[in-house]
Swiss-Prot record:
SUPFAM superfamilies: Ribosomal protein S5 domain 2-like. GO terms for cellular component: cytosolic small ribosomal subunit. Gene3D superfamilies: 3.30.230.10. Keywords: Ribonucleoprotein, Ribosomal protein. Belongs to the universal ribosomal protein uS9 family. The lineage of its organism: Bacteria, Pseudomonadati, Pseudomonadota, Gammaproteobacteria, Alteromonadales. The keyword Cell wall biogenesis/degradation does not apply. It comes from the Bacteria. One of its GO terms (molecular function) is RNA binding. The gene is rpsI. PROSITE patterns: RIBOSOMAL_S9. The keyword Protein biosynthesis does not apply. GO terms for biological process: translation. This is Small ribosomal subunit protein uS9. Pfam families: Ribosomal_S9. It comes from Shewanella loihica (strain ATCC BAA-1088 / PV-4).
């Protein structure tokens, strides 16, 4: 792998994102589509840009992403995690500020499985006293 390209893997819920960052003009491409076209929701686009805005590299890096699995929120979170890891590979001095913002830690929350005898993961059937 060339020294000009930086890689980070991000995960969130059931989504996995492979992020490649290189010096450029600030283009973000997700699954061969521009960020604004891929994510319809403004909140998802904002989540993806958070680590770049924090370290003020929005216009300095081109980001190329391949993301699989999950929904909009999970994919946006996975991309954010991947971008954070790629930034740390680029410059280890960015780690403390990214850690303070909470971008380095992988969000371990996943959907809890449904249990036998219950309606959902924790919702019990209605109880009738008589």
């Amino acid at each position: 792998m060339s020294a000009t390209q930086y890689y980070g893997t991000g995960r969130r819920k059931t989504s996995t994102a492979r992020v490649f960052a290189k010096v450029g003009s600030g283009n973000i491409v997700v699954n061969q589509r521009p960020l604004d076209e891929y994510f319809g929701r403004e909140t998802a686009r904002m989540v993806v840009r958070q680590p770049l805005e924090l370290v003020e590299m929005t216009e300095k890096l081109d980001i190329y992403v391949t993301v699989k699995g999950g929904g909009i929120t999970g994919q946006a979170g996975a991309i954010r995690h991947g971008i954070t890891r790629a930034l740390m590979e680029l410059d280890e001095a960015l780690r403390p500020s990214l850690r303070a913002a909470g971008f380095v830690t992988r969000d371990a929350r996943k959907v809890e499985r449904k249990k036998v005898g219950l309606r959902k993961a924790r919702r019990k059937p209605q109880f009738s006293k008589r």
